[in-house]
């Protein structure tokens, strides 16, 4: 006899389906049997009898009377049996009407009750079946509360080591002790050393937190249990706590091992926020996690690693010594780190001989590891699309632009007058980027629409990584932001909506200068900010200003004056270089793209030389751009 519970559980499904089919067939037959019967009143029945239409009667003791007409039509009426007295029945029989009495056994009452109860019975069987299936790892999401959703990655398959991680040498050094402990915990125990129970990896998205954790597991050659913080919280209260206990139990059984919890803030947020109460499911899960991290012995060879983008909102009990002792921050990679990361992602890819990895790294400031990987893959896809056997520098440049602003939208139709405005707008940014001494160098100018909103853009990239920005650099940056609007007003004597985002960014930067960085003589070196309230109650709801209304007016007035003076400076510089601006506009309008090197060369030319350079170019056909917008 097979006593396998899974085998018995697998039989419930077919039986459940057969039961539903049988009930549906039964209900269909019952419906067919009653669909041809017409409900009438007792008076109508008497009239039909008097009209000699009825040929037979069936009288139920419960008061149900069924009558059959000569044409086969069936009628049904409920009437007290006292109305059908003996004398009346005999009279009917004498008239040739067949009268039959039926004893009611109560079967119809049970059938009626069963029909009413059928939906509830089906629902109960359905839930019972799904819960039985959930025990074997099947069933609906949320009902599968008995299953531990942690995914185990075998370090021997698809192994990742520190050789696959670049640009974070300091992080590797911090994690070397963890690797050595997992390889040989007895060596640490002999010296009386205790390894940290937990390692918290924090940093911006895409900086490689998960990759680092898997590299530690690969270096130590131990099992790696991966689970997202949101996986702990499910439909039923107590499920998350049970999963925490199951996760640690399984890791202990396969120690040494690494438990990695991604997006820890999903389950580890600060408690007692007033939302959900003390018995909130997430808080119960967090309590279970705190208990488990206190309960296991570090000598067991279990290391808990977690990643989050928001360490500031984690519960303080989770960060105290004895739980997540070691805290490691992964920052956005600098120039050298980007160069090393690009080299790793170029492994196994055919690239042209003239590819300069350092130049690619310089062209991608602010890119994190995930962006760089996406950029290299995008370049490979572009080369494959053109059926080329290697990746060229043009592929990489196009891939960088795709990552920053999206793919070119060649199908978007721009009218000639809109194209003129976009041309002058972008050159307003670019010319000021060259003229202002502290502005970042221009890398590329294009009027080809990209992404959702960009009708064109001017790419300015710093020549080196900067960690501090001076006041003159910020001021020149603001003037450059206003260059697009200034060019529109100078050339066409009107402005468009294209400068909306520029104004927004410039205003935000000026507000930060005035109110927080102390770069205003009138306001002074004081940080006028806002005190942020509880994150979980909503920042805007509980945010309080730490300055008076009078101070707010002074700040707004200073911001306005600074924006207006910067705008005047932008217009003056562009007006002084109007002839050069017009020649550059003719060139950009026809070519649609200007590289940073070519733009610099054109800005260094005198006006006559620039005029010959532009008008003698074979691609320049339209030259009458700036006479009138209309």
Swiss-Prot record:
SMART domains, sorted: AAA
Q: How is the cofactor bound?
A: Binds 1 zinc ion per subunit.
**Enzyme class at the top of the EC tree:** hydrolase
Amino acids binding ATP: 203-210
Which segments cross the bilayer? 9-29, 111-131
Ranges per topology, Periplasmic? 30-110
For this chain, the family text in UniProt reads: In the central section; belongs to the AAA ATPase family. In the C-terminal section; belongs to the peptidase M41 family.
Name used for this protein in its record: ATP-dependent zinc metalloprotease FtsH 2
* Native organism: Petrotoga mobilis (strain DSM 10674 / SJ95)
């Amino acid at each position: 006899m097979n006593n396998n519970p899974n085998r018995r559980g697998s039989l419930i499904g077919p039986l459940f389906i057969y039961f539903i089919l049988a009930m549906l067939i039964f209900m269909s037959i019952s419906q067919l049997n009653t669909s041809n019967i017409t409900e009438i009143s007792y008076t109508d029945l008497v009239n039909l009898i008097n009209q000699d239409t009825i040929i037979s009667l069936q009288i139920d003791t419960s008061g149900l009377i069924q009558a059959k007409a000569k044409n086969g039509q069936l009628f049904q009426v409920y009437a007290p049996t006292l109305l059908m007295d003996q004398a009346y029945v005999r009279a009917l029989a004498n008239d040739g009407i067949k009268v039959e009495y039926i004893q009611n056994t109560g079967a119809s009452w049970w059938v009626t009750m069963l029909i009413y109860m059928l939906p509830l019975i089906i629902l109960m069987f359905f839930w019972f079946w799904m819960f039985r299936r959930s025990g074997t790892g099947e069933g609906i999401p949320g009902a599968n509360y008995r299953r531990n959703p942690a995914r185990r990655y075998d370090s021997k398959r698809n192994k990742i080591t520190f050789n696959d991680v670049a640009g974070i040498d300091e992080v590797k050094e911090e994690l070397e002790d963890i690797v050595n402990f997992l390889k040989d915990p007895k060596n640490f125990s002999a010296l009386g050393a205790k390894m940290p129970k937990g390692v918290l990896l924090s940093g911006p998205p895409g900086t490689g937190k998960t990759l680092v954790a898997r590299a530690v597991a690969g270096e130590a050659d131990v099992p790696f249990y991966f689970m997202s913080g949101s996986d702990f919280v499910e439909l039923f209260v107590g499920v998350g706590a049970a999963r925490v206990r199951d996760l640690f139990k399984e890791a202990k059984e396969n120690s040494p091992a690494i438990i990695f919890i991604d997006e820890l803030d999903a389950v580890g947020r600060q408690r007692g926020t007033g939302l959900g109460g003390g018995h909130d499911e997430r808080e119960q899960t967090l309590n279970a996690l705190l208990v488990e991290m206190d309960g296991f012995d570090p000598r067991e060879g279990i290391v808990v690693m977690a990643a989050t983008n928001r360490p500031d909102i984690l519960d303080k009990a989770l960060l105290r010594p004895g739980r997540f002792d070691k805290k490691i921050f992964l920052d956005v990679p600098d120039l050298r780190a980007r160069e090393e990361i690009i080299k790793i992602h170029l492994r196994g890819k055919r690239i042209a001989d003239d590819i300069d990895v350092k130049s690619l790294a310089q062209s991608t400031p602010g890119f994190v590891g995930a962006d760089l990987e996406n950029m290299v893959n995008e370049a490979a896809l572009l080369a494959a699309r053109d059926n080329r056997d290697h990746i060229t520098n043009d592929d990489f440049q196009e891939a960088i632009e795709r990552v920053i602003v999206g793919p070119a939208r060649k199908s978007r139709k721009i009218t000639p007058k809109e194209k003129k405005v976009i041309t002058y707008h972008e050159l307003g940014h670019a010319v000021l980027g060259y003229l202002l001494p502290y502005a970042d160098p221009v890398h590329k100018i294009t009027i080809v629409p990209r992404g959702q909103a960009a009708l064109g853009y001017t790419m300015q990239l710093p020549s080196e990584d900067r960690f501090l920005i001076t006041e003159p650099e910020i001021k020149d940056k603001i003037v450059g932001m206003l260059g697009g609007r200034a060019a529109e007003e100078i050339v066409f004597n009107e402005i468009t909506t294209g400068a909306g985002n520029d104004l927004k960014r410039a205003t935000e930067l000026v507000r930060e200068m005035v109110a927080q960085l102390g770069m205003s003589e009138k306001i002074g070196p004081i940080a006028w900010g806002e005190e942020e309230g509880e994150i979980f109650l909503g920042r805007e709801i509980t945010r309080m200003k730490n300055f008076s209304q009078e101070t707010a007016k002074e700040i707004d007035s200073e911001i306005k004056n600074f924006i207006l003076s910067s705008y005047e400076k932008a217009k003056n510089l562009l007006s002084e270089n109007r002839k050069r601006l017009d020649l550059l506009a003719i060139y950009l309008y026809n070519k649609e793209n200007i590289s940073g090197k070519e733009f610099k060369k054109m800005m260094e030319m005198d006006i006559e030389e620039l005029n010959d350079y532009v008008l003698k170019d074979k691609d320049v056909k339209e030259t009458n751009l700036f006479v009138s917008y209309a």
